[in-house]
Amino acid sequence: MTHIPKRTLVTTALPYANGPVHLGHLAGVYLPADIYVRYKRLCGHDVIHIGGSDEHGVPITITADKEGISPQEVVDRYHTMNAEAFAKCGISFDYYGRTSGPVHHQTAREFFLEIEKKGIFVKKTEKQFFDPKAGRFLSDRYITGTCPVCKTPGANGDQCEQCGTHLSPTELIDPKSKLSDATPELRETLHWYFPLGRYQKQLEAFVERHTGDWRSNVVNYSRTWLNQGLADRAITRDLAWGISLPLDSEEAKGKVLYVWFDAVLGYISFTKEWAEKQGDAELWRRYWQDPETRIINFIGKDNVVFHTLMFPAILMAWNEGRSEGRYELADNVPASEFMNFEGRKFSKSRNYAVYLGEFLERFPADTLRYSIAMNYPENKDTDFSWSDFQNRTNGELADTLGNFIKRSIDFTNSRFGGQVPADIDLEAWDSLGIDWLASFGKLEAAYDGFHFREATAQTMEIARFANRFLTESEPWKVIKVDPEAAGRTMAVSLNLCHTLALLFWPIVPETANRIWKMLGFEGTIDELVEPGNPVWRQALEPGLKKGHKLLGSSEILFSKIEDKDIEPEMKKIEALLAEAEQREAAKQPVPMTFKPEITFDDFQKIDLRVAKVVACEPVKKANKLLKLQLQVGSEQRQVLSGIAQYFTPEQMVGKNVVLVANLADRTMRGELSQGMILTVEGADGRLFLLEPQGEGINGNSVS
């Protein structure tokens, strides 16, 4: 017999508070977790659903720098935005926390100090880029330069967006600091490392213990890392935004916890905050430190090793040498594959996405929940398309479920006074043609095995059966010759409505509650579910007795989606795909068309010199022009250049440029220009400077 734990803790990967969540996030993590939690609640289980925002890390500080605001303002904005979008979508968190909060900071520091006290961390000195102007060390994403592979300028220190190559900052050609545009210097810095290899054997045993119940992708990702051997992993960074190290030593100054270490601890700190709101500050321990709790971590496949290796290793380090206050490890880590969008991967950086909040401004949440549940990326990547969304809403939700519910209630209201016209005994219920015990057994197995697409499809199949039953029974005809038979048909139909309301509640909760209300019940299904009350089993049997009074009115559960409703979205896709094609074309070699041939003597007439920009200012009433004061050896020149759209005056000062020194003077916008500086035009039309490097080259010839 399967052991049923006393309680279940469900956590969801923390979305990064640096932008809005999109449908890919919803499909991979938050909707499946919510469906599972709602199912468990229906079964009467003690289950809590914990989520929240990951609010630390470099991308947040970069966004803050770009917008001229504080990191706290960035995370405040996106935490609120995402929390509201989740609530509107019916994602039923028991608590949605923030890693920037005091309880989380305290929890993360407690873990650090406990592991530090045991002497587990390893300290290492390494070389890292340092911005001499800004006076701070730079993380990968604060460094930009030319990609060594495709030679595209503007590559980040961790990856080139143009060719996709993963990089380290030291590989960049001509690296620059994004903070000051200064050339960074390699300097030594000290960091704390977590020795993952110390727990290699324990982690191998942990993964192997779950090979029979974890998804194959989770096991395979974990084994790949284990087979390579687990290395030490840095847990600190030189950064101003984050959780500062709780040490007074000089070497700890300016260090914060690396986000991979602190974010997963949010599951624990958020459970603590939830417990405080329940009036019992120690209640969280029952969900984290009791073997009678089953812990489920819902994540996407890109987060697997953080939850199967790194987070467990942190908990193992805490537990080491302890007999009390030991943390339990996850029972399952149902990691999904990715959901793509119209054949391509979701991409925030390229704005190729459908954001949850924006979607819900146009379409009901339940239509999205159903469409994604039927396309859940369990074992392979799936694709969200507007046409599939339209077809499922119209053909399955509106024409099948919605049609059956409305016909059943409308006919009862009009011909039977809005009351259930007959009692349905179990014999009649079981003779409908559905093996209820077998059907429920399959549904329970699907939910318990995290097969949400299968569970959704089976539930819709019961709706199809109900719709066929009503259509084939033709009570609108039978009532003319046998009112009692028509009454029995409607009693069966109404009880099927009752069953469907309960079965669909995990998938489309708002719709289920609307059906519940039309059936004449007070309150909502949400108010029925509580530990120890197995509402789920009520769907097995007829739940409406003869004489039960319906609400007396019905409503259309789902409006059909017309072509004109999704046409604007399709046009957006066309525009985004056109942009993508342009980017792809930019990667291809540019066809060369050369100017007419000149002789070597002609070329020798051009005098190219290295000049340094000593001052720069905009040209009045000229949006494209900058006025540069150049030092060319012992001479000073004034040059006007059409680069104002790509460089600020502040960025230009101090740069070396290539000057055409013997170009005839000319006047532009009333200003004298004594030459021209050389630039290169990129595929997107952006201009890049030619910047000679080296000491003592000012005024020298370029050849």
UniProtKB/Swiss-Prot annotation:
Matching entries from InterPro entries are given as: aa-tRNA-synth_I_CS (IPR001412), Anticodon_Met (IPR041872), Met-tRNA-synth_bsu_C (IPR004495), Met-tRNA_ligase_1 (IPR023458), Met-tRNA_synth (IPR014758), Methionyl/Leucyl_tRNA_Synth (IPR015413), MetRS_core (IPR033911), MetRS_Zn (IPR029038)
Keyword Repressor present in the record's keywords: the answer is no
Q: Where does ATP bind?
A: K348
One Pfam family cited in the UniProt record for this chain:
tRNA-synt_1g
Q: Where is this motif: 'HIGH' region?
A: 15-25
**Location relative to the cell:** Cytoplasm
Q: Which GO molecular function entries does the Swiss-Prot or TrEMBL record give? A: ATP binding; metal ion binding; methionine-tRNA ligase activity; tRNA binding
Protein keywords: Aminoacyl-tRNA synthetase, ATP-binding, Cytoplasm, Ligase, Metal-binding, Nucleotide-binding, Protein biosynthesis, RNA-binding, tRNA-binding, Zinc
Q: Which cofactor does it need?
A: Zn(2+)
Catalytic activity, reaction form: tRNA(Met) + L-methionine + ATP = L-methionyl-tRNA(Met) + AMP + diphosphate
Positions of the tRNA-binding domain: 602-703
- Free-text remark on how the cofactor is bound: Binds 1 zinc ion per subunit.
Q: Which residues participate in Zn(2+) binding?
A: C147, C150, C160, C163
Q: Where is this motif: 'KMSKS' region?
A: 345-349
Per the UniProt entry, the Enzyme Commission number(s) are 6.1.1.10
Q: Does the keyword Electron transport apply?
A: no
Would you name any one GO CC term? cytosol
What does the entry give for GO biological process? methionyl-tRNA aminoacylation
HAMAP family from the xrefs? Met_tRNA_synth_type1 (MF_00098)
Q: How does it assemble?
A: Homodimer.
Q: What does this protein do?
A: Is required not only for elongation of protein synthesis but also for the initiation of all mRNA translation through initiator tRNA(fMet) aminoacylation.
Regarding protein family, the annotation reads: Belongs to the class-I aminoacyl-tRNA synthetase family. MetG type 1 subfamily.
Entry protein name: Methionine--tRNA ligase
- Species the sequence originates in: Chlorobaculum tepidum (strain ATCC 49652 / DSM 12025 / NBRC 103806 / TLS)
Quick one: which gene encodes this?
A: metG
